[in-house]
Amino acid sequence: MSMYGRDPWGGPLEICHDSATDDDRSRNLDLDRGALSRTLDETQQSWLLAGPGDQGRKKKKYVDLGCLVVSRKLFVWTVGVLLAAAVFAGLVAGIAKAIPRHHRPPPPPDDFTVALRKALMFFNAQKSGKLPKNNNVHWRGNSCMKDGLSDPAVGRSLVGGYYDAGDAVKFNFPAAFSMTLLSWSVIEYSAKYEAVGELGHIRDTIKWGADYFLKTFNSTADTIDRVVMQVGSGATSPGSTQPNDHYCWMRPEDIDYPRPVVECHACSDLAAEMAASLAAASIVFKDNKAYSQKLVHGATTLFKFARQNRGRYSAGGSDAAKFYNSTSYWDEFVWGGSWMYLATGNSSYLQLATHPKLAKHAGAYWGGPDYGVFSWDNKLTGAQVLLSRLRLFLSPGYPYEEILRTFHNQTSIIMCSYLPIFKSFNRTKGGLIQLNHGRPQPLQYVVNAAFLASLYGDYLEAADTPGWYCGPHFYPIETLRNFARTQIEYILGKNPLKMSYVVGYGNRYPKRVHHRGASIPKNGVHYGCKGGWKWRETKKPNPNIIVGAMVAGPDRHDGFKDVRKNYNYTEATLAGNAGLVAALVALSGEGHGVDKNTMFSAVPPMFPSPPPPPAPWKP
């Protein structure tokens, strides 16, 4: 199959060529036009045969315009009228320019753009370490400036990164997924980010995460034997009074208890996700060659470690198993391998990501109730959409075509499962899809599905494909966008409670977010480990508004409890907000669509290898 494939809707894609050759054009230019014999018409004969007197008389009465002969008087009158009209038009134009104008103001931003700007602010509120001057969250300050250094087993700086949610733990697994998702959205929709003035903001957000990840392993080495998976502790055993990030309720700026560092030596899922994060970021920062190459090197080292040291990062019984348990690492191999290929152009990564046995281990053929649910734990659906992009736009052909076609077909089926007509997932009476089957904290899964649906619709449009099939039924692209739009509109307030689940958006939103920094006033008072409990227990609204935070969401009956202690309703997370940002930018504005080429900036042309030269001829 060729690099570009065939037009799926019929007709060749070849550009028509001019039938005349360069030699033909050259010979035509060499011809002496004056030497050609031809018959003169009657008008030309009259010019040659008429005497001097005859020509003089005709010039006085008529003007020859080539295609016709007109009266000289009529010609002069017509020219005069045209000149007068031109002068008049010039005067009118000059007067119009001199009159002051009232320019029509640009249209107000749409709801999705307004929400996008707010959702990005959440990441500013979650930053750890020494904050930049333009952080713009007045109630936040420098925090946890001794991370890593205070742990004698580590002895190096792990300052920076992001707090995961309402506590002060830094979990690398969901944080890396969050940064991968943000980078993906920038690669696809950089024009939209730039149009609303947020491109620099989100690039800074991604770089803050990438710079921290580079600290969590030996990023200058080619081979490593460990990766930091967590800073801080959230585990509390019954009756324990040991100060940590869950027992205590303190502003991050006031933390004075030990913050342990947890490393892993066999964690394929974590390392492959971190590799995906750095690889995707390297495409975002391809305009900074040195930094991009630094990210690629780190990603390469991590992915090598992931393959050589098999295991789940949460298998050791750490905090991760309680808060962010990883069920498998095979999906991260497909996901990470895809991003490594796109960042490097090295076909060995694509061969791995499209290996049939790897797809089988990742659950590509299993189905089941969670099939098609994209999250920090399961990246298979994201990888399927990403590799469908490769097939739609580059069509690499053999030996990748078979598995790419399978992933493409599975992506179509997943998109069908999101539609209410097929009832693959339940919905609340208010219309919210239940991708986690009625369990708590549903919104993080909803925003991811909305992003993928909108993105896949844009892929189809960019490939000049008007829709896709669900069995025998054809659905237009707008069906995908309608699904994504209605789900995000529910989150922004179009729900039975008329409540926005994004803090700071709309007139009614959660006021008691499960968040230490937002719930404790910045009043110059140092509230210790237990001293902050009163702010956790109070029923008063948070003194600080954590703008842009998407809370966990309603229950399966569209109900919501704005209670600080109930994190199943009121806690916001990095992964949830990353999906929200991606979905909002995909739906925002008009036009633009996806950037087809930036994603493939490191991918070499996929022309087939030329055949070997023939052996020398011998008689």
UniProtKB/Swiss-Prot annotation:
Query: Where would you find this protein in the cell?
Result: Membrane
In Gene Ontology terms, what is one molecular function of this protein?
A: cellulase activity
- Segments on the Extracellular side according to the record's topology features: 96-619
Provide the phenotype resulting from gene inactivation.
Plants are dwarf with reduction in cell elongation and decrease in cellulose content.
Give me the segments passing through the membrane. Answer: 75-95
- Keywords recorded for this protein, A-Z: Carbohydrate metabolism, Cell wall biogenesis/degradation, Cellulose degradation, Glycoprotein, Glycosidase, Hydrolase, Membrane, Polysaccharide degradation, Signal-anchor, Transmembrane, Transmembrane helix
Q: What EC class is this? A: hydrolase
The keyword Disulfide bond is annotated on this UniProt entry:
no
- Give the CC-aspect GO terms: membrane
- The EC number on file is 3.2.1.4
Taxonomic superkingdom = Eukaryota
Question: Active-site positions, per UniProt?
Answer: 167 (nucleophile), 514, 562, 571
Q: How does it sit in the membrane?
A: Single-pass type II membrane protein
Single GO BP term:
cellulose catabolic process
Known InterPro entries for this protein? 6-hairpin_glycosidase_sf (IPR008928), 6hp_glycosidase-like_sf (IPR012341), Glyco_hydro_9 (IPR001701), Glyco_hydro_9_Asp/Glu_AS (IPR033126), Glyco_hydro_9_His_AS (IPR018221)
Q: Which PROSITE patterns match?
A: GH9_1, GH9_2, GH9_3
Task: Point out the glycosylated residues in this chain.
Answer: 218, 325, 346, 409, 426, 568
Q: In which tissues is it expressed?
A: Ubiquitous.
Induction notes from the record: By gibberellin (GA3) and brassinosteroid.
> Reaction catalysed by this chain?
Endohydrolysis of (1->4)-beta-D-glucosidic linkages in cellulose, lichenin and cereal beta-D-glucans
Cytoplasmic compartment segments:
1-74
Assigned protein family: Belongs to the glycosyl hydrolase 9 (cellulase E) family.
Question: What is this protein's function?
Answer: Involved in cell wall assembly during cell elongation.
Protein's UniProt name:
Endoglucanase 9
Question: What is the organism of origin for this protein?
Answer: Oryza sativa subsp. japonica (Rice)
